[in-house]
Structures are given as C-alpha cells and as structure tokens.
Amino acid sequence: MPSHRSALDNSAVAVVIPVKAFHQAKERLSDLLTPAERIVLAKYCADRVINAARNFDIFVVCDDPDVAQWARDHKTKIVWQPEIGLNAAVREGVKFAATQNKQLAIVSHSDLPLATEFEHLINDQSAETLLSSVTLVPDRHEDGTNVMVVPTNFDFDFSYGKNSFAAHQKMAKKYGLSVRILHDSSLAVDIDTADDLAVAQQLEN
C-alpha cells in the first residue's frame, strides 16, 4: 500500500502560531461575551490548534507573559516578539524556525476552533513541491488566510489582514513560488464575529 506521508520528514517542519494576549483577544465579541468568557474562548481555540500541531515542533510567537506560560505548559518553543504586529511576528517566527533547521513552516492562526490536524497539508507531496510552493488555506469567505505553508528559506512578506488570501497569492508569484490552494472546512472557520462563533458551534455539533 502506498504511503500517504510527505516526502519531507515532520522533523523538518515547524508549526508557527502567533498568539495574541488572551485578555485582549476577541474584543469584537464584547457585546456577546464577558471578558472572562472571551479569555476562555481564546484559550479553547488556541488549545485546539496546538493539539492539531502535535506531530510537529511548535513555535508560539507572543509578547504576553500569560501566553508564554501557556506555551511552556504545552511544551512549545517560544519566540518572544514584543509589540511588532502580526505580519512582523510571523516573519520572525518563520525566521527563527529556519535557525532550528526547519525547512518548512506551517503558519496558523490561533483562533481555529475546528482544527484537528495539519499533516494533510503536506501529505502526498514531494519535498521538491513543498519547498518550491506556498500552500494557502483561506477562511470561509476566501478573504483571509487562516493557514499557510511556506519554505523557510524565503524572506516571505506576510500580508495578513483584509484580502490577505489574494495578497499572499501575489506575493508567492513574486518570489517565483507556485501556489497550492486547499479548501478545508475544519480550518476555514476562525472566530472574529458573532456569526463566526455561530457557524463554529453549528459545525462542531
């Protein structure tokens, strides 16, 4: 029976997860959830992402002591990057992964409540394909980029925010990297609005 594993060993792959301070997370849900409930939600989502990444070395990029302690409790590596913004934080996380001999980085948002695993993003792909391409997993609106897979030897200019899905495709082509797009319902739902939360609860049930 043929193997479904990637030709690139998991030890060469990092999962990079930028994590915002839990007490600052999900402020757009303040009309629906109390501050304590928002912290619980943020930690629940982040725990799901960490568990989904369990078969890889995990690098949590953060600038908050509570998040750093949470990351230690999960036995992840910590990339401390105070107050530099999401795009720069991801860039530094990927750079640090490269210094740890990681050839590939799976970059994931921390607010994916339905995440179960990341292996399928690289399975059945040759090392040559993975190291010469960018894999994008868009959100359910095909506007944002919830997860992406990038080679660590490119100084990729991350462009998270509105229309990042399109922006990351353009950036990949600028670097001469091919683009793989994977639609995945378990990774497409991130929690920014009450509607997102309702969709996640419906799909979870």
What residues fall within each predicted segment?
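The conserved acidic donor/metal-binding loop of glycosyltransferases
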Residues: 109-113
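N-terminal nucleotide-binding beta1-loop-alpha1 segment
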Residues: 1-29
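Short phosphate-binding loop-to-helix
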Residues: 72-106, 185
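Conserved alpha/beta core of the MobA/IspD/sugar-nucleotide pyrophosphorylase nucleotidyltransferase superfamily
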Residues: 2-8, 163-205
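Acidic donor-binding segment of Leloir-type glycosyltransferases
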Residues: 56-77
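Short glycine-enriched, charge-decorated loop/helix-capping segments at active-site entrances
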Residues: 29-37
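A short, N-terminal amphipathic alpha-helix
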Residues: 40-57
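Conserved donor-nucleotide/metal-binding helix-loop-beta segment in metal-dependent transferases, i.e.
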Residues: 115-142
